[in-house]
């Protein structure tokens, strides 16, 4: 049985006064029934991503699988934008030799959303390009076959997306937010909407889609 995923349909939440919102996933990753791999290599040494890969093994393969993290290069700006997130996740898998490779890359996706009349923070979030949604792009390579998806996201306050753009994407929106608000630069999502980054990553493949 999977986790409680009711939050996936709860778009608008403002309990802490930031005005941010959770936006449902963009493209689910659909994998067929597969035998568990002998090992999983994650294209990052960050503990959060290694833990996410362990959870992926349980969710998709139904088994615990040895997981190792390695340092890789994304080939995209520090703050990926739109298609750069998936491109960066794919780039990170190049040259990594394992039966299963898992790659994560967060990025800003500029999108349009249906804003409810009760949303009082419209001007703080909606700019000329729409709203900036921070989402995780995930690529999984299993025995040479590639799968990809883009998970649920969190609206990024306009000022921080614009600060990142002004730096020519060298400064991430998360680091700009951390400097202003004191939230963790790599997991500010929990502070704004009560859903942490690990859950947002997991939303790419869970609940599992039927094939």
Where are these regions (language model features)?
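Helix-enriched interaction subdomains in cytosolic or periplasmic regions
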Residues: 2-18
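Anionic-ligand binding patches
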Residues: 79-211
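N-terminal polybasic phosphate/anion-binding patch
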Residues: 21-98
